[in-house]
């Protein structure tokens, strides 16, 4: 807890939720195909009202001031983009939420993007729940850039510290994480 008070800060509250509800030790295969003894599934936190509120306020502080939308790859980013857009509205800031599909819609317009689409050239911040190698985030970034949007930043809840930052930098992206995996793992009793 913070030294000045016995009441945990929002950052400490969120760290506690992630450590107790999202983090597991064991033998896991990640979405990247890699094996790991650490697993982080943020959905038990991001799909709870109070957890999403904590995440959204924290992520909003890292969305570029001139961004007009936040976007992310479905499914992990779905609650994040909606929550951050709502947190922005609470501060009288217009910020739309976009969902990037994993593949083009098979019917209707065949759209990759869902939501109120801004004008081409608009700055969009990409949101992610967990970054490992950066593959999911980069897929979202490429779809947005192909649609004519400017993307320079990815904000994630957790950076697993497995090369995602280097992959982002190679694509001229800044990666900002609310937490590093090492910070969450250190918070959990052995």
Swiss-Prot record:
<comment type="subunit">
    <text>Homodimer.</text>
</comment>
<dbReference type="InterPro" id="IPR029057">
    <property type="entry name" value="PRTase-like"/>
</dbReference>
<dbReference type="GO" id="GO:0044205">
    <property type="term" value="P:'de novo' UMP biosynthetic process"/>
</dbReference>
<feature type="binding site">
    <location>
        <position position="160"/>
    </location>
    <ligand>
        <name>orotate</name>
    </ligand>
</feature>
<feature type="binding site">
    <location>
        <position position="132"/>
    </location>
    <ligand>
        <name>orotate</name>
    </ligand>
</feature>
<feature type="binding site">
    <location>
        <position position="105"/>
    </location>
    <ligand>
        <name>5-phospho-alpha-D-ribose 1-diphosphate</name>
    </ligand>
</feature>
<protein>
    <recommendedName>
        <fullName>Orotate phosphoribosyltransferase</fullName>
        <ecNumber>2.4.2.10</ecNumber>
    </recommendedName>
</protein>
<dbReference type="InterPro" id="IPR000836">
    <property type="entry name" value="PRibTrfase_dom"/>
</dbReference>
<comment type="similarity">
    <text>Belongs to the purine/pyrimidine phosphoribosyltransferase family. PyrE subfamily.</text>
</comment>
<keyword id="KW-0665">Pyrimidine biosynthesis</keyword>
<dbReference type="InterPro" id="IPR004467">
    <property type="entry name" value="Or_phspho_trans_dom"/>
</dbReference>
<dbReference type="GO" id="GO:0019856">
    <property type="term" value="P:pyrimidine nucleobase biosynthetic process"/>
</dbReference>
<feature type="binding site" description="in other chain">
    <location>
        <position position="102"/>
    </location>
    <ligand>
        <name>5-phospho-alpha-D-ribose 1-diphosphate</name>
    </ligand>
</feature>
<keyword id="KW-0460">Magnesium</keyword>
<keyword id="KW-0808">Transferase</keyword>
<comment type="function">
    <text>Catalyzes the transfer of a ribosyl phosphate group from 5-phosphoribose 1-diphosphate to orotate, leading to the formation of orotidine monophosphate (OMP).</text>
</comment>
<feature type="binding site" description="in other chain">
    <location>
        <begin position="128"/>
        <end position="136"/>
    </location>
    <ligand>
        <name>5-phospho-alpha-D-ribose 1-diphosphate</name>
    </ligand>
</feature>
<comment type="pathway">
    <text>Pyrimidine metabolism; UMP biosynthesis via de novo pathway; UMP from orotate: step 1/2.</text>
</comment>
<dbReference type="InterPro" id="IPR023031">
    <property type="entry name" value="OPRT"/>
</dbReference>
<feature type="binding site">
    <location>
        <position position="107"/>
    </location>
    <ligand>
        <name>5-phospho-alpha-D-ribose 1-diphosphate</name>
    </ligand>
</feature>
<keyword id="KW-0328">Glycosyltransferase</keyword>
<dbReference type="GO" id="GO:0004588">
    <property type="term" value="F:orotate phosphoribosyltransferase activity"/>
</dbReference>
<feature type="binding site">
    <location>
        <position position="101"/>
    </location>
    <ligand>
        <name>5-phospho-alpha-D-ribose 1-diphosphate</name>
    </ligand>
</feature>
<dbReference type="GO" id="GO:0000287">
    <property type="term" value="F:magnesium ion binding"/>
</dbReference>
